[in-house]
Amino acid sequence: MVAALALAGCRHDSFTIEGTIEGGANQTVWLEELAPDGPIFIDSIPLDGQGCFSYTYRMPYRSFYNLHTTADNYIVTLPDYGETVDVHGRWDNLSLSYTVEGSPESVLLWQLQQYTNEGARLLADLVDTTNHYQQLLQDGKVSQAAVDAKKRFTDSLYRDERDRQREYVYDFVDQNRGSLSTLIALYKTFNDRALINPRDSVGEQCYRTVREGLQERYPDNPHTRHFAQ
C-alpha cells in the first residue's frame, strides 16, 4: 500500500516534503509522482490548524513530485534522496505564490516557473491592452488607425517576450545539463505554444543536450529511457 511507503527516517531512499500553506488551515493537499507515462497519485496530506504539513516518501527512483491544492493549482518538485523540500505558499494560488528551499533541483524548477509566470503576466497585460483598444474603437473614442498602431506595438512586445522565454530555456538547458529539470524546461510553452521546436536546428541541439546529459548522469532512470524512445 502507498501508506507503507511513507516511512519517516529512511533518509537514504526517501525525501520529506513539508511547509506551510497560508489560508489552508485544516485543508488537504495531495502528492503525486509525475512519472514518465503520466501522473500517479501517492497520498493525501492533511494540513493542521496553521496550514502546516510534513510527509516522507520512499522514492523508487529520482522523479518529479507534484503537490496539489486543487487539480489545476500545483507545484512541481524534484527532490533528491535525503532532502527535505520546504514549501511555502498561498492556498488559493500556490503555483504563483510558492517558494521552495532545501532541494537544489526543486529550486531550479521554481526559478524556471518564475520566469514562465513573468511571461504569462506580460501576455495577460497585452491581451488586456488589445481588448481595451477594441472597446475604445467600438465606443468611437479612437480610430481604426490608432488600434492598428497599438496592435503593431503589442505584437512586437509579444514576439520579444516569446524570444526571451525561448532563450531562457536554451540557457537553462545548457547550464543544467544532466539535470532532470531540463525535461520540464524542454516542454515549456508561451501562449500555449511550444517554445522549443525539435525540428529546427537550435531546437534539435537543445533536445540532444537534454538527452545526452541525462544518459550520462542517469542512464537507468525511467525518465531518461522514456525520453530516449
Regions found by a protein language model. Name each.
Residues 201-229:
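N-proximal helix/coil linker or "cap" segments that precede and/or mark the start of modular domains
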Residues 1-8:
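Sec-dependent bacterial lipoprotein signal peptides
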Residues 156, 194-203:
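Short coil/turn connectors between adjacent alpha-helices in alpha-solenoid helical repeat scaffolds
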